[in-house]
Amino acid sequence: ISRYGLFPFASSLDTCGVLTRSVKDAAIVVDAMKGIDKYDQTSWDSSDIHLYEAIDGKVDGKKLFYIKEITDISNYPDASKELKRHLEIFYETIDKLRKVGVEVEEVSIDKTLLQAIPSVYVCLSCAEATSNMSNLTGIIFGPRGKGDNVMDMMKDHRTKGFSPLIKRRFVIGSYVLQKENQERYFVNAQRVRRLIVNKMKELFKTYDALILPVSTGVAP
């Protein structure tokens, strides 16, 4: 799905998707939206892929996997009732899938690699967001800030225009992109991401899909 027209955050991570109430609805919407777009160089020709037509209801023999370290309640010593219930529902879903012929297997992944994911995400996403949004100065884009000179106008615009959370991300992004920090943080985060990607590619040689709870709780 083309990203043209959307506001970029982290270019190497941003993807488009749809939220629907069923797999069929998702297939219909994505079939209508997918395809190559000359305005998005990351898009590709998917005209030979027809998701809705591929839905035949036959799941027998499909192989799914879930990650033990994420779904094992013993890994959450202070688990809330909500989290416990979410995981109960997850395992109930696994049982239902197995009853209709889907093979679902538990896979263990190195905890060190899994624990690195949040840090890698923060490092890469904040760095890319800082770069992507550096043009929002109030001079060319956005409302004009107040001030007697260009620097004061940009400071006023960016101070008022971004939330505290976004500002914190800019601070992190600017820090990891500094020349003296790039190798230690940004480049190493890219290397760890490659390890994560390679691990997932290896698993998808055996399995058709990954199944996991969407989150450990509702949004705050």
Give residue spans per PLM region.
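Predominant activation on well-ordered alpha-helical scaffold segments within soluble catalytic domains
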Residues: 24-31, 91, 130, 134, ...
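A short helix-breaking turn/cap at a secondary-structure junction
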Residues: 1-88, 152-156
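Short helix-loop capping/hinge segments that flank enzyme active sites or metal/cofactor-binding pockets
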Residues: 58-67, 71-76, 123, 127-197, ...
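Acyltransferase
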Residues: 51, 82-110, 141-146, 153-157, ...
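Generic secondary-structure signature for well-ordered alpha-helical cores
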Residues: 18-24, 28-39, 95, 99-103, ...
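Short connector loops at secondary-structure junctions
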Residues: 100-121, 172
